[in-house]
Amino acid sequence: VVERAGGKLTVTAMLLKITAQALEKFPKFNASLDFKNKEIVYKKYIHMGVAVDTERGLLVPVIKDVNKKTITELSIELGELAEKARSKKIMPDELQGGNFAISNLGGIGGTNFTPIVYRPNVAIMGVSRSTVEPVFVDGEFKPRTMLPLSLSYDHRLIDGAEAARFLRWICEALENSLITMF
């Protein structure tokens, strides 16, 4: 369906959709800290940045209202923004307004990394390369795709237990992705 519409179904596109649902369930991760007014700002919208590797360095285009878009729409927009970033055609307003970001190094490789939270955001998720690993299930080894995820977050707002629940929710949604995405 996605490919017929001109998009490409990627892990990042799936994570955008699933993470938007997680941000609705865990609103602290979709907030920011306003140091001037000394308050927490809970966003009523979900705008997500996606790190794109370019020859000029990392750029983070923002997809607006992720929670209101289909997986097909997200796949197409992600591809268009990434291409604009790589071809130096991205506009400044397309790099602003994100509340949460995803950085996917899977195409480069590696097993884990720690992304840095971009202020005023309070969290960012890192995605490493997926692998197929043997997992012991019901008395036998079965092949399972493993996707290493990492989460960096601001402890002034989010504690470790909340972060673990947030990331666990995303993992469970990925395991049941056909139910949550379409």
Question: Whereabouts are the PLM-identified features?
Answer:
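C-terminal catalytic/motor cores of large multi-domain enzyme assemblies
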Residues: V1-F182
